[in-house]
Amino acid sequence: MLVSAKEMLDKALAGKYAVGQFNINNLEWTKSILLTAQEMHAPVILGVSEGAGKYMTGFETVAAMVKAMDKSLGITVPVALHLDHGTYEGCYKCIKAGFTSIMFDGSHYPIDENIKKTTELVNVAHNLGLSIEAEVGSIGGEEDGVIGMGECADPNECKAIADLGVDMLAAGIGNIHGKYPANWPGLSFETLAAVKEKIGDMPLVLHGGTGIPADMIQKAISLGVSKINVNTECQLSFADATRKYVEAGKDLEGKGFDPRKLLAPGCEAIKETVREKIDLFGSAGKA
């Protein structure tokens, strides 16, 4: 059964570990992540960007697939289905489709408008028992055409948004989506500590979890990060394993071209990446 992300993240904050949000793009991604979370007895959040939702023919298709797969696979660990970087309109579409958690990314609005829209969505989400994430300070890199420079959030703006009653807050601390450049200066723990001081006991979210060194991840968790988003790393490992399969000519052996065989190495690679992250985040055995 799908659940809101609130309880799992409150537990993570109290227990000083983080829950992984792994973005899904299709059936193979979803199945691989669910099976790995179950195997490791870890709570998990399935993230869906608006672009991925559109690719999978809409949020209703996504919700139906995830709910059916959760049941068919006999998954017993807590699973939240979460809209990632949602627009105002996208949030309402996901609420209607049956998602259990939403993220409203109002970081590109002036702070007053961000507050107004966030307040409205907090009330709607909480009335329906859903969790809601908000963002302050854009996350760098590109996510489905949304480009941010990786700025650091203003701790006072973070407090203003946190006070609206959101369940988790994504604060920009120099993190970016996608591959990190060689000259990346690292996470701003100074900003993270200042934000934490302002918002108190609220789970913080780290976007762009791919490529951040393990010691930085662990320090971020110790400072109150309770949800870490991973997407690019699963895509890279899937692509790498699939490329090796084809380059080795295995698609030409017998029925190696069957998509169930062709995609299997990529699925195993996703599972391995998810395993590594669950171990790093400390959420194994926490379901």
In which residue ranges do the predicted regions lie?
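Active-site gating loops and adjacent loop-to-helix segments of metal-dependent hydrolytic enzymes
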Residues: 247-258
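Short catalytic-loop micro-motif centered on adjacent basic/acidic residues
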Residues: 19-23, 81-82, 103, 204-207, ...
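Active-site proximal loops enriched in glycine and acidic residues that flank catalytic Cys/His/Asp
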Residues: 173, 208-210, 232
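Family-specific functional microsites
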Residues: 246, 263-273
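Alpha/beta enzyme core
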Residues: 3-15, 27-52, 57-76, 85-202, ...
